[in-house]
């Protein structure tokens, strides 16, 4: 079990981090989405498929141009990650808007401040790079995530909904936004 005091460090992810990122990604989906999406969507997210995905992300594949991935470490162990990149929403300017595509933690560190500080780290870097707005999507019904994002200063945009959850699965997600400047 991880106990997080006030110290978590953040750094860009490397290819060596991919197996742990994939494990956390799968655990995050299990924790956050069980009961909200079809069980088949969860069971098809194998470690092998997640490793393949994260190799593509870190390799800057076509879908992931200009994306960045940061990991959170506690005592040298990766306990979370965040993926961000230019927004592809047609109603925002991608040159000034960053989208947080993923924020997942090892379930053992949830509620200990790591997610908040990792998200702050990503948003601080985006602001320093000239971004003015951040967006992200929350699966409709994921009340824990909605409460978290509201608590850390995000505003819900319930009228902006996407149906794509990834890997060909569709589920409604509502957009959230936060000004960076």
Task: Locate each region found by the language model.
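Acetyl-CoA-dependent GNAT
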Residues: 3-8, 12-16, 26-35, 41-108, ...
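Hydrophobic pocket/interface hotspot
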Residues: 21, 25
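Short hydrophobic/aromatic beta-strand or adjacent loop that forms the aromatic wall/cage
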Residues: 67, 170-175
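Conserved glycine-rich acetyl-CoA-binding loop
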Residues: 93, 102-120, 129, 140-147, ...
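Conserved beta-strand-loop-alpha-helix junction that forms the acyl-donor binding cleft
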Residues: 136-146, 162-168
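A secondary-structure capping/hinge motif
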Residues: 152-159
């Amino acid at each position: 079990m991880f106990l997080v005091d006030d110290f978590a460090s953040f750094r860009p992810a490397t290819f060596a981090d991919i197996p742990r990122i994939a494990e956390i990604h799968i655990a995050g989906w299990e924790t956050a989405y069980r009961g909200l999406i079809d069980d088949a969507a969860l069971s098809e997210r194998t470690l092998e498929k997640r490793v393949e995905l994260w190799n593509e992300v870190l390799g800057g594949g076509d879908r992931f141009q200009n994306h960045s991935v940061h990991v959170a470490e506690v005592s040298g162990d990766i306990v979370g990650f965040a993926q961000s990149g230019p927004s592809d929403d047609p109603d925002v300017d991608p040159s000034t808007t960053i989208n947080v595509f993923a924020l997942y933690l090892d379930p053992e560190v949830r509620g200990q401040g790591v997610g908040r500080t990792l998200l702050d780290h990503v948003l601080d870097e985006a602001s320093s790079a000239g971004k003015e707005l951040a967006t992200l999507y929350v699966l409709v019904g994921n009340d824990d995530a909605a409460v978290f994002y509201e608590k850390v200063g995000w505003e819900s945009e319930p009228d902006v909904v996407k149906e794509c959850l990834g890997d060909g699965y569709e589920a409604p997600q509502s957009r959230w936004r936060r000004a960076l400047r």
